Amino acid sequence: MSDIAERVKKIVAEHLGVEPEKVTESASFIDDLGADSLDTVELVMAFEEAFNCEIPDDAAETILTVGDAIKFLEKNAA
C-alpha cells in the first residue's frame, strides 16, 4: 500500500470515527462509512490540507470512495 493510501485511510478513519479495517479502497464514504454531505466536504478539506493540494469542486464531486480519493491524490498531490 502506498504512503498516500495509508494517509488517506487514516484521515478517513479519524474524521468519520470508523474502525480502520472498515476503510477499504472500495468503501463508499456515504453508503459504507456513514458519512453525510458535510462529512464529505470536510474530508475533501482534510485531504487538501494533508496533501497540500487543491481539489476543485468538479473533482470533489467524483470522489465517492476511499479508492477515488487515493487515485486523485496519487495523480495530483504535491
UniProtKB/Swiss-Prot annotation:
4'-phosphopantetheine is transferred from CoA to a specific serine of apo-ACP by AcpS. This modification is essential for activity because fatty acids are bound in thioester linkage to the sulfhydryl of the prosthetic group. Its main location: cytoplasm. The modification O-(pantetheine 4'-phosphoryl)serine is found at residue 37. The keyword Lipid metabolism applies. Pathway: Lipid metabolism; fatty acid biosynthesis. Gene3D superfamilies: ACP-like. GO terms for cellular component: cytosol; membrane. It is found in: Cytoplasm. Residues 2-77 form the Carrier domain. GO terms for biological process: lipid A biosynthetic process. It comes from the Bacteria. Keywords: Cytoplasm, Fatty acid biosynthesis, Fatty acid metabolism, Lipid biosynthesis, Lipid metabolism, Phosphopantetheine, Phosphoprotein. One of its GO terms (molecular function) is acyl carrier activity. NCBIfam families: acyl_carrier, PRK00982.1-2, PRK00982.1-3, PRK00982.1-4, PRK00982.1-5. Carrier of the growing fatty acid chain in fatty acid biosynthesis. This is Acyl carrier protein. The gene is acpP.
